Amino acid sequence: MKIFGTLYDKTMQWANHRFATFWLTFVSFIEAIFFPIPPDVMLIPMSINKPKCATKFAFYAAMASAIGGAIGYGLGYYAFDFIQSYIQQWGYQQHWETALSWFKEWGIWVVFVAGFSPIPYKIFTICAGVMQMAFLPFLLTAFISRIARFLLVTHLAAWSGKKFAAKLRQSIEFIGWSVVIIAIVVYLVLK
């Protein structure tokens, strides 16, 4: 079953679309609030296809992500009672409890780590609002962490170039199915 090759090809096509930058910005914005797919999925192929625009792509993604993070913060600050049921429904309850304990222990540094790492950033934006973290330090830290991450991702993708993309395409089925199997094993072990 060749699923990942088709997805890879579609992603590369979308990265060349004339509205790709708009969609990257949109995905970056909604990912910081609720969307489960990180903007890296678009950033990487866009930076491979247009390496001279890598910095611009990182900036757009970081700005949109920081603005989305501000919306997430507002949801946590003003509407937590409403969204709490969605956190449980979407399966983020354990992440939520972990985030709360991390905020109590490390404060603003949690926002930086969440913004730079692949852990669910949206949980931490909402949590920052619930914890009533100072807004401007939150926003600044969110932007710095996101721009650092996205610059790293885009410049690595631009540097690796089309040769890497061709090699990745050859191995994408193996990589994709390996990730699925690892995710299932991790889920079963942690369950």
Swiss-Prot record:
Domain of life of the organism encoding this protein: Bacteria
InterPro entries cross-referenced by the UniProt entry: DedA_domain, VTT_dom
GO cellular component: plasma membrane
Name of one Pfam family that matches: VTT_dom
Protein's name according to its UniProt entry: Uncharacterized protein HI0703 homolog
Lineage of origin: Bacteria, Pseudomonadati, Pseudomonadota, Gammaproteobacteria, Pasteurellales
